[in-house]
A protein has these predicted regions:
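ATP-dependent carboxylate-amine ligase
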Residues: 1-35, 40-50, 136, 271-276, ...
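Residue-level detector of alpha-helix initiation sites
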Residues: 10, 122-126, 260, 309
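Residue-level signal for inorganic ion chemistry
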Residues: 19, 81, 118, 194, ...
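Short beta-strand "acidic-cap" motif of Rossmann-like dinucleotide-binding folds
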Residues: 26-30, 143-144, 171, 245
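Short, polar loop motifs at secondary-structure junctions
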Residues: 30-34, 50-52, 70, 82-91, ...
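Phosphate-bearing ligand-interacting subdomains
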Residues: 44-99
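Phosphate-binding loop of NTP-binding sites
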Residues: 72-76, 85-224, 231-238, 267, ...
Length: 426
């Protein structure tokens, strides 16, 4: 079988890797001729390169990659296509899908499985893992994955895995930018909404538009929303069944009121699925923070809070609960200047020190300009390496609390693992 992957962003590259891993041949293309291909699981030595100033072609036995152009004939020869989720609904994708089937239509075993989606701005990954632990403790075989940006292997990987295995439940993390795509690809029975916040506004433009996307997504499904969620009346009207959830009241290792709500959502879904209360309680009592998500470590006198918080609402939810001496903030990509609004929140809470480090890309200069324009009068420091971050953490470790977060999941995981190691040795 051969598939065409159109668009080599995060989801596209994860689709390529999943297809190759499942024995498919792949034609992959992106109009950007400078796409970073380092995370494709293909040995470079096995490839032939054809390169000019505008286009690049890479050929091996199992994959052909065209950058800077698209070979329509190569797409026509494929059994299925995998478009980038962000392209779904656009004119180009619609034209492609008139002539070629999407992978989720060629492989459709996943559509017969009981399927739960978790979406929202913040807390999706943690909630998915909480629910997975509960369901597996109840004896269910769960296939979990979805949103490549959340650390999973992408939506197409779920389609491929479901085709080959036997599972009781499909559990999907759904990015808020891919609601229409996921609504087409999967047949959701239940959907949980963690929250609605200020993220991906370059796509949604307004919260009202985001709400409208959710209304479309919720139509005809059993939907779980927080008891005080904005737009609950709209969501209830769209849903086949609407269930409110509340903050979790039992033992939980994770910090923050936001995680009590995440646990409340996971437990509400479990109750609807008739999972025994003691199974839910024991599963959540043992639950550890997901790698890269908010966790707390002790170094000398300081509590070190470390975790990805890449939008203003995520950061505010942490800073509103604790006074921090220093905030370490990872910077966004060059084309994501809107994400710098996390610095507005940082300045509002007025820590003694703000430390900037390269997160997704080295946009420290942009972040420095933003801080200065906001009139922040505290101490601003910049660092470029993990060792420099650790040196400053040690310097501040006799204060009460330090926060490390912002953008850059991989960078934050590296920091988290080093901090954890130091904490365990003390």
């Amino acid at each position: 079988m051969r598939a065409a992957v159109i668009g080599l962003g995060v989801e596209g590259k994860k689709a390529v890797n999943s297809l190759l891993r499942h024995g498919w041949e792949v034609y992959a293309t992106d109009l950007n001729n400078r796409v970073d291909l380092s995370d494709l699981d293909v040995p470079i030595m096995s490839m032939d390169f054809v390169n000019d100033e505008q286009t690049v072609s890479i050929v091996s036995d199992e994959i052909t990659v065209d950058l800077g152009f698209t070979n329509s004939y190569a797409i026509e020869q494929c059994d299925a296509i995998a478009i980038a989720p962000s392209m779904y609904g656009g004119a180009f994708a619609t034209r492609l899908l008139r002539d070629s089937p999407l992978l989720s239509d060629v492989l459709d075993k996943h559509k017969s499985m009981f399927t739960i989606g978790i979406t929202g701005t913040n807390g999706k990954t943690t909630t998915v893992h909480m629910l997975k632990n509960i369901l597996e403790s109840a004896g269910k075989k769960v296939l979990v994955g979805g949103n490549g940006g959340g650390g999973f292997s992408g939506y197409y990987d779920l389609v491929l895995e479901a085709e080959e295995g036997e599972y009781d439940i499909l559990l999907v993390e759904v990015c808020d930018m891919t609601l229409d795509f996921c609504n087409y690809c999967f047949d959701f029975d239940m959907v949980g909404l963690t929250n609605i916040g200020n993220d991906h506004m370059d796509v949604h433009k307004t919260i009202a538009n985001y709400k409208d996307s959710l209304v479309r997504f919720f139509k005809g499904k059993t939907v779980f929303t927080a008891f005080n969620q904005d737009f609950n009346a709209d969501f209830k009207e769209a849903a086949a069944k609407s269930i409110s959830y509340f903050s979790y009241q039992d033992e939980l290792k994770l910090v923050g009121a936001f995680n009590l709500l995440n646990a409340g959502l996971a437990s509400a879904i479990a109750r609807e699925l008739k999972v025994p209360k003691d199974v839910v309680r024991d599963s959540l009592a043992d639950f550890e923070a997901v790698r890269g998500r908010m966790d707390v470590y002790k170094i000398n006198n300081a509590s070190i809070y470390v975790g990805k918080t890449d939008n203003s609402d995520a950061l505010a939810s942490i800073l509103s609960e604790k006074d921090f001496y220093a905030l370490f903030i990872g910077t966004p990509r060059y084309n994501e200047e809107h994400r710098l609004d996390i610095l507005d929140v940082a300045v509002k809470y007025n820590p003694e020190v703000i430390v900037l480090f390269p997160g997704l890309e080295d946009t420290v200069d942009m972040a420095m300009y933003r801080l200065n324009s906001l009139g922040y009068e505290g101490n601003i420091k910049t660092v470029n390496s993990l060792d420099e971050i650790i040196e400053l953490v040690a310097e501040y470790s006799h204060e009460d609390a330090i926060f490390i977060g912002g953008n850059g999941q991989d960078a934050i995981i590296d920091i988290q693992e080093r901090i954890k190691l130091i904490s365990e040795k003390l």
